[in-house]
Amino acid sequence: MNKEKFLQDAKANYVENPTMARVYDIHGGKYFVTYNGYFGMIFDKADNVENLFRNGVCNFASMSNLFSNNTVFSSGKILLSPYKEVEYEGMPLQVLEYMPGESYYNVYIQKEFMKYFSKDAEFYSSAHSWNKIHISGVFVVENGEIVGCIMPVNVDRR
């Protein structure tokens, strides 16, 4: 996980677009930092990100619940496998796939966010049903710990 690069990019983006930048207080002395609304990474208190942006730390129960160790995968988790890269309206996308039952589903995320994670990172989504597409975010896991969350651009069936 490349925390330093992420923090550099977050600070630079904050100057251009401060309304999307947030530091959320989540569980267990951790913070979720996002700078564009589509992607964020998890930091420890020791990383000193509380004052990264001028608006300080936000406390939203829904964000804290999203990353709660008890609820993040309470309805099941699906491993998403990198499938291929595509381009949509000039934006490079990484396609992740999963197969509930007999139908393959593609989950499209912005490729640029992949640079912050190791090659061994795993991608998961929580699912309410194996028969329905319900993805509120792609969780990035390194060494068994959730380190980030990416919002999908699109989900489809092939």
Language-model features: locations:
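DNA polymerase processivity clamps
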Residues: 1-158
